[in-house]
């Protein structure tokens, strides 16, 4: 359902039934990677190949997957569930996510249904829902940061939110 390239050669594609594919040759060939057991039957809907040390993906069921470079293993080979606590003390977001945007090595933003926009500043340990002026009837489809401070969230019924303060 999504693909993200770090450079002209290295890319990750994700999809139905926990599918994760990795390419080292610009997409000419793809190799399967194992999704975490908890996500093996999930629809992975968005992927961000952020850097040589980190990549994140999300499922439509509110799960966040993370791949980090380890001693002798490049990013994209091993995937783990990102367990986190939201402000309500929950260990699962419990929302249908639609997109993830990586702003820095440790900061990412999430969008979803029912007016859901959230941010993590610590790599996903704590996820904080953001206050929005539109109420909970707007579904957000995508969020992108233009630079370190300015970003746009796009939602249902032509909704468009801008931030000038990093989310």
Enumerate the predicted regions with their spans:
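Residue-level hotspots at or immediately adjacent to binding/recognition sites across diverse folds
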Residues: 1-167
């Amino acid at each position: 359902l999504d693909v993200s390239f770090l450079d002209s050669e290295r890319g990750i594609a994700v999809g139905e039934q926990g599918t994760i594919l990795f390419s080292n040759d610009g997409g000419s060939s793809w190799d399967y990677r194992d999704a975490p057991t908890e996500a093996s039957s999930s629809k992975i809907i968005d992927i961000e190949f952020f850097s040589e040390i980190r990549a994140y993906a999300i499922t439509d069921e509110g799960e966040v997957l993370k791949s980090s470079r380890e001693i002798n293993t490049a990013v994209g080979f091993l995937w783990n569930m990102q367990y986190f606590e939201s402000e309500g003390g929950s260990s699962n977001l419990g929302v249908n996510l639609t997109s993830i945007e990586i702003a820095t090595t440790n900061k990412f933003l999430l969008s979803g249904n029912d007016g859901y926009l959230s941010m993590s500043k610590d790599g996903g340990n704590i996820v904080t829902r953001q206050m929005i002026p539109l109420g909970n009837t707007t579904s957000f489809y995508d969020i992108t940061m233009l630079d370190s401070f300015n970003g746009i969230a796009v939602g249902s019924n032509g909704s468009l939110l801008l931030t000038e303060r990093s989310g």
